[in-house]
Amino acid sequence: MTAIDVMWVGLGGGIGSLLRWWIGLSIGKVYKGNFPLGTFLINISGAFVIGYLSILFSVDWRDRYGDLMNAAVLTGILGGYTTFSSMQLDAAKLATARGRAIAAGYLIISVLVGLAAAAFGAWLAY
């Protein structure tokens, strides 16, 4: 790892985080429901893009952090864009406000749809 690698990951992470913030804010202005739609759509779209680009970039999953494009785009931008921690916070809020079953359903749906989106993105890239 070099200083330039750290710079690319940090720059990508900043870009991804800003995209997540802007998209989440935009969705929140339009959607006023109880479902955490912003986090859901951000994570699903991120899963799709990472599935697609991982094939396009020929990612070797045993050494997926070494290449500059992987570091800047997959780890940096998409790592900053997607948000596991916000999904967990949303689930905790759902559990308090609407019950544990709703929260568990949200987590299960998020994971399954995310896996399907990543697989679909990878399939499209082949």
Swiss-Prot record:
The keyword Cell membrane applies. GO terms for biological process: cellular detoxification of fluoride. It catalyses: fluoride(in) = fluoride(out). This is Fluoride-specific ion channel FluC 2. Its main location: membrane. Keywords: Cell inner membrane, Cell membrane, Ion channel, Ion transport, Membrane, Metal-binding, Sodium, Transmembrane, Transmembrane helix, Transport. One of its GO terms (cellular component) is plasma membrane. It comes from Yersinia pseudotuberculosis serotype I (strain IP32953). Na(+) binds at G79, T82. One of its GO terms (molecular function) is metal ion binding. It is found in: Cell inner membrane. The lineage of its organism: Bacteria, Pseudomonadati, Pseudomonadota, Gammaproteobacteria, Enterobacterales. It is a multi-pass membrane protein. The keyword Cytoplasm does not apply. The chain crosses the membrane at residues 7-27, 37-57, 65-85, 101-121. Belongs to the fluoride channel Fluc/FEX (TC 1.A.43) family. Fluoride-specific ion channel. Important for reducing fluoride concentration in the cell, thus reducing its toxicity. Na(+) is not transported, but it plays an essential structural role and its presence is essential for fluoride channel function.
